[in-house]
């Protein structure tokens, strides 16, 4: 069994989603949001994110962490803040010796919905379906669960399927 933590980083709200994978089947463990205080400086917000991720790592002991890659914002200041939040989340996971993988928004949508330009509500719907949830989680938590699901799909990708079948190489006849 593998426990995967998906992280949707943000300087105000960082979503997290935990799933377990066993025999190529996934199941929901937990999800939620780490909300930072509005009235503190960026450095203290980053510490809150770090502490929140460390708490999740200590409590659930995931061995693999998946996080969304940065995409270019129209506002460079927002992109920098997102980069900081992403960085401290990665450091928190790395300090617990977890394997960390990064995925683009397009890869996540393609893996979960089957369409790389899917809308957020389509992703949320598929998260509910794939994890057999009674209702949709909070927006940032649903995104984090989608990231974890994407990682599960990618780690069990085509190359592993081909390798597990024990296919033999055949010599091509001319």
Swiss-Prot record:
GO terms for molecular function: crossover junction DNA endonuclease activity; DNA binding; magnesium ion binding. Binds 2 Mg(2+) ion per subunit. It catalyses: Endonucleolytic cleavage at a junction such as a reciprocal single-stranded crossover between two homologous DNA duplexes (Holliday junction). Its EC number is 3.1.21.10. Mg(2+) 2 binds at residue 68. The active site is at 8, 68, 140. It comes from the Bacteria. PROSITE patterns: RUVC. It is found in: Cytoplasm. Mg(2+) 1 binds at residues 8, 140. GO terms for cellular component: cytoplasm; Holliday junction resolvase complex. The keyword Cytoplasm applies. It holds the Pfam family RuvC. It is an enzyme of class 3 (hydrolase). GO terms for biological process: DNA recombination; DNA repair. Belongs to the RuvC family. NCBIfam families: PRK00039.2-1 (NF000711), ruvC (TIGR00228). HAMAP family: RuvC. Homodimer which binds Holliday junction (HJ) DNA. The HJ becomes 2-fold symmetrical on binding to RuvC with unstacked arms; it has a different conformation from HJ DNA in complex with RuvA. In the full resolvosome a probable DNA-RuvA(4)-RuvB(12)-RuvC(2) complex forms which resolves the HJ. The RuvA-RuvB-RuvC complex processes Holliday junction (HJ) DNA during genetic recombination and DNA repair. Endonuclease that resolves HJ intermediates. Cleaves cruciform DNA by making single-stranded nicks across the HJ at symmetrical positions within the homologous arms, yielding a 5'-phosphate and a 3'-hydroxyl group; requires a central core of homology in the junction. The consensus cleavage sequence is 5'-(A/T)TT(C/G)-3'. Cleavage occurs on the 3'-side of the TT dinucleotide at the point of strand exchange. This is Crossover junction endodeoxyribonuclease RuvC. The gene is ruvC.
């Amino acid at each position: 069994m593998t426990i995967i933590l998906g992280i949707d980083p943000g300087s105000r709200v960082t979503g997290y989603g935990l799933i377990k994978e066993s025999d190529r089947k996934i199941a929901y463990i937990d999800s939620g949001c780490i909300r930072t205080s509005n009235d503190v400086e960026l450095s203290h917000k980053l510490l809150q994110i770090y502490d929140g991720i460390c708490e999740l790592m200590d409590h659930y002991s995931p061995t693999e962490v998946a996080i969304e890659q940065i995409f270019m914002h129209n506002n460079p200041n927002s992109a920098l803040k997102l980069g900081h939040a992403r960085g401290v989340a990665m450091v928190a996971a790395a300090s617990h010796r977890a394997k960390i993988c990064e995925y683009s928004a397009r890869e996540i949508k393609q893996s979960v919905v089957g369409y790389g330009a899917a809308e957020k509500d389509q992703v949320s719907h598929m998260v509910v379906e794939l994890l057999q949830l009674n209702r949709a989680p909070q927006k940032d938590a649903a995104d984090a669960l989608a990231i974890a699901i994407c990682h599960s799909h990618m780690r069990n990708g085509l190359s592993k399927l081909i390798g597990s079948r024990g296919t033999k190489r055949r010599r091509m006849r001319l």
